[in-house]
Amino acid sequence: MREELVWIDCEMTGLDLGPDKLIEIAALVTDADLNILGDGVDVVIHADDAALSSMVDVVADMHSRSGLTEEVRASTVDMATAEAMVLDYIGEHVKQPKTAPLAGNSIATDRSFIARDMPALDAFLHYRMIDVSSIKELCRRWYPRIYFGQPPKGLAHRALADIHESIRELQYYRRTAFVPQPGPTTSEITAVVADLQGVDDAPEATDSAQERPSG
């Protein structure tokens, strides 16, 4: 099995595999140390007005505020073309099929839509998946200090931005959770977050496991 990870995030009109549509897909490949390889790919897929008007209010508002809805209307890219674009990028860095796991946050939902709409992409990926949200849930139970100290999450709700956040989140857990017991102090956690956010001087932190994250 190769060391690369294929990070994918999808935006849909909803979460129901029956009627809902895949309208944006982005992909980034990283090496085993989570260094991004290449520029990645981000594709907005056309959907008709009937599909867009069927979105529930919270999803419609989210995609309207992010600008995705208008981009979907204007897009001329169909599903097959989008799949080919994603595979072309992944193929630049992952040469053999079924060798690179799919990675992301709550990635099973994304993979369900990929399996439905992009079977060649689904078949190219290894069956194993690395779900950052699983690590988050374990830290909440085993290392609450790490969980409550995690970097704030943005609210872009766009595929490529969400992938960058997921990679940064796994970098955070790698540097704070995947260390010998009892794990890092709150001050060490704060320093990791500051480094990942590009902040020179980390603020002082109280060594508490109860302070909730800001995002």
Curated annotation (Swiss-Prot):
Keyword Oxidoreductase included in the entry's annotation: no
List the GO cellular component terms: cytoplasm
**Molecular-function GO term, any one:** 3'-5'-RNA exonuclease activity
Q: Can you tell me which family this protein belongs to? A: Belongs to the oligoribonuclease family.
Give the species: Mycobacterium ulcerans (strain Agy99)
Source organism phylogeny: Bacteria, Bacillati, Actinomycetota, Actinomycetes, Mycobacteriales
All copies of the Exonuclease domain together span: 5-170
Q: Extract the coiled-coil ranges from the record.
A: none
Domain of life per record: Bacteria
Catalytic positions? Answer: 127
Give the Enzyme Commission number: 3.1.15.-
What does the UniProt record say this protein does? 3'-to-5' exoribonuclease specific for small oligoribonucleotides.
Q: According to its UniProt record, where is this protein located?
A: Cytoplasm
Instruction: Give the first-level EC class, as a single word.
Output: hydrolase
Q: Does the keyword Ribosomal protein apply?
A: no
Tell me the protein's name. Answer: Oligoribonuclease
Record keywords: Cytoplasm, Exonuclease, Hydrolase, Nuclease
For this protein, the record's HAMAP family field holds: Oligoribonuclease
SUPFAM superfamilies according to UniProt: Ribonuclease H-like (SSF53098)
